[in-house]
Amino acid sequence: MLEHNLDSHGILHLHPKGALAKEDFASLAKTVDPYIEKQGDLAGIILDVAKFPGWDSLGAMAAHIRFVRDHHKRVKKIAVVTDAKLGDVAEKIASHFVAATIKHFPAGQTQAAEQWILGKG
């Protein structure tokens, strides 16, 4: 399950609460696509996660890959807020596959991540 909200600054906040499902990415697209259509690129994404929860099926993994493929050029920055090793891996490896700048922040540093995305920190 993936809780998400898109704030008034164009920052998409993602909070995985369990294994990711195919429907999570359909719901995410319903939130993000109209914003991109009207406002342009997202300022950023904040992924606030204790540990990567995985996917509930191969279909969910494929939906995740499609979502990234279809949207990564429309996101300027990605902040990964976690104490898990995922943060370091995402910052070093994922940057080769997405257009956004990726930065790792320790758990609890969501406000610092927001400031970085907004160019204030």
Language-model region placement:
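Amphipathic, Lys/Arg-enriched alpha-helical "gate/interface" segment within cytosolic domains
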Residues: 1-121
